[in-house]
């Protein structure tokens, strides 16, 4: 019987294939501390990583045969340290695609139609003063241009969904891909053309603070920013200034640089819709994520090559 360490209290649906093994997992909705992980990881043959897993923790996992990242983005795992230890790290990009794309579209609608702002005003103001034709005008998605930065699985799915709303779609990606639903362009063109910009690139040294004050200055006045990728891609101070000045009409944010903290200055703005990193938070998606991680672990235990190894082993 192998021991599998699960760093966070994830839903157990989808883990049935691992029930013959010893599962170490914290209480639901909680997570092991770094010290607890250091104490437990020497006992583990595999890890399902739902958050940060630094090199000093990985290196004491002498029995580890695989680290299965519970998500598409794996910037929280020190993949170089794992590679140096001969431990493959996997991710599960396919299972989160549709749910995250749906959330991006939902945030576009919420910001464009001022749904979040109107919900807040109805709860704290005189409702009668909020009704009336011509008040609090929003904007439709139809006919507007969506700029997608990062056209991997999720970016492509967002492009397909946006087309169904009648949007024109342009895309900028590290490796341009041929898309029936989007036209490739460079980043300056995208920033200056798009009415809505949606981020779907990974957080790397190259993309950290990709959208800074200079980038916001290139955007169309009244543009909207959607971020369901990683908070570190955006310079939050520059974003806040662009929102307050009116350079941006609004933003829909699911991710933040220092989660679980959300900058108070963003929460204070009515034209910002914030969600707490819920891109994959559907029952169906979470079960699919657990099932995919379980299969990767079983493949590693059986001497097979798991799918989606991200650290070159």
Regions found by a protein language model. Name each.
Residues 45-46, 66, 196, 224, ...:
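Short, Asp-centered acidic motifs that coordinate Mg2+ and/or phosphate
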Residues 26-29, 70-71, 87-98, 173, ...:
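Short beta->alpha connector loops at strand-helix junctions that form conserved
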Residues 1-90, 192, 212-214:
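An N-terminal-biased, well-structured beta-alpha scaffold segment characteristic
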Residues 85, 221-313:
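Rossmann-like dinucleotide-binding domain for NAD(H)/NADP(H)
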Residues 85-87, 93-145, 160, 172, ...:
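Phosphate-binding beta-alpha-beta segment of Rossmann-like dinucleotide-binding domains, i.e.
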Residues 55-58, 168, 174-265:
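Rossmann-like adenosine-cofactor binding region
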Residues 151-152:
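Glycine-rich Rossmann-fold phosphate-binding loop(s) that bind the pyrophosphate
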Residues 155-156:
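N-terminal Rossmann-fold NAD(P) dinucleotide-binding loop
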């Amino acid at each position: 019987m192998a021991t599998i360490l699960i760093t966070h209290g994830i839903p157990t649906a989808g883990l049935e294939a691992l029930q013959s093994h010893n599962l170490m997992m914290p209480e639901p909705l909680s997570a092991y501390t770094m010290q607890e992980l250091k104490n437990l990881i020497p006992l583990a043959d595999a890890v399902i990583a739902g958050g940060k897993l630094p090199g000093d923790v990985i290196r004491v996992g002498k029995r580890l045969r695989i680290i299965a990242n519970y998500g598409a983005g794996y910037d929280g795992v020190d993949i170089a340290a794992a590679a140096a230890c001969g431990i493959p790290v996997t991710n599960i990009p396919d299972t989160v695609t549709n749910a995250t794309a749906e959330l991006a579209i939902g945030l576009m609608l919420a910001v464009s139609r001022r749904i979040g702002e109107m919900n807040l005003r109805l709860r704290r103001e005189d409702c009668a003063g909020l009704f009336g034709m011509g008040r609090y005008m929003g904007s439709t998605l139809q006919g507007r241009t969506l700029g997608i930065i990062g056209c991997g699985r999720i970016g492509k799915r967002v492009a397909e969904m946006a087309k169904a709303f009648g949007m024109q779609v342009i895309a900028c990606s590290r490796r341009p891909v041929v898309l029936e639903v989007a036209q490739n362009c460079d980043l300056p063109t995208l920033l200056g053309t798009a009415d809505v910009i949606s981020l779907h690139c990974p957080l790397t040294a190259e993309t950290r603070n990709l959208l800074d004050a200079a980038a916001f200055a290139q955007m169309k006045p009244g543009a909207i920013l959607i971020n369901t990728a990683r908070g570190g891609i955006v310079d939050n101070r520059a974003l806040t200034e662009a929102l307050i000045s009116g350079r941006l009409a609004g933003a829909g944010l699911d991710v933040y640089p220092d989660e679980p903290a959300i900058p108070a200055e963003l929460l204070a703005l009515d034209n910002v819709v914030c969600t707490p990193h819920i891109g994959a938070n559907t029952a169906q998606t979470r079960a699919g994520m657990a099932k995919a991680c379980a299969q990767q672990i079983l493949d590693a235990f059986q001497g097979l090559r798991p799918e989606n190894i991200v650290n070159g082993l």
